């Protein structure tokens, strides 16, 4: 990715997290986010459709990075699900301040949906036969 694009993405996300830590999602405007990120509104809209699209992208990114941090060096199976659960819990504790900001207010309930999506991806990558098996596909 182009360095300028990376810097712009980082500025947008940092500005959003700063605002989200102080305000409800519905109260954040593109105008104030752009002022804080030192970008034009057209630049923001080149990256995201609206504030809600940015929020959705950050939610998925946060949960994905939590899962990536625990699956990087260890092989999980259904037989050692207790180890996976413990590691997942510890990863969430380590990232709790970011998770609290991104999933605060009305968005708190979306954390479960994002978790379910990532767990399905993880299980189906290891056990693809479970995806279409009604008895095994408990998610």
Predicted regions mapped to residue ranges:
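Basic, amphipathic alpha-helical hairpins
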Residues: 18-25, 69-75, 95, 126
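Short, hydrophobic secondary-structure boundary micro-motifs
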Residues: 28-29, 100-102
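Basic, helix-initiating cap at the start of DNA-binding domains
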Residues: 1-19, 23
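Short linear capping/connector segments at secondary-structure termini
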Residues: 71, 102-108
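Hydrophobic alpha-helical connector segments
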Residues: 70-98
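Amphipathic alpha-helical packing segments from all-alpha helical-bundle domains
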Residues: 106-131, 137-138
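Alpha-helical structural segments
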Residues: 10-18, 36, 53-72, 83, ...
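Helix-turn-helix
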Residues: 19-52
């Amino acid at each position: 990715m182009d360095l300028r694009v990376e810097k712009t993405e980082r500025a947008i996300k940092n500005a959003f997290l700063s605002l989200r830590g102080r305000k409800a999602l519905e109260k954040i405007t593109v105008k104030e986010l752009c002022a804080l990120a030192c970008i034009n509104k057209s630049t923001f809209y080149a990256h995201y459709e609206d504030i809600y699209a940015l929020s959705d992208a950050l939610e998925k990114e946060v949960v994905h990075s939590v899962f990536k941090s625990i699956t990087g060096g260890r092989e999980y199976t259904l037989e050692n699900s207790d180890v996976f659960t413990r590691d997942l819990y510890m990863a969430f504790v380590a990232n709790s301040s970011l998770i609290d900001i991104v999933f605060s207010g009305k968005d708190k309930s979306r954390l479960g949906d994002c978790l379910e999506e990532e767990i399905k991806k993880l299980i189906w990558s290891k056990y693809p036969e479970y995806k279409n098996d009604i008895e095994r596909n408990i998610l």
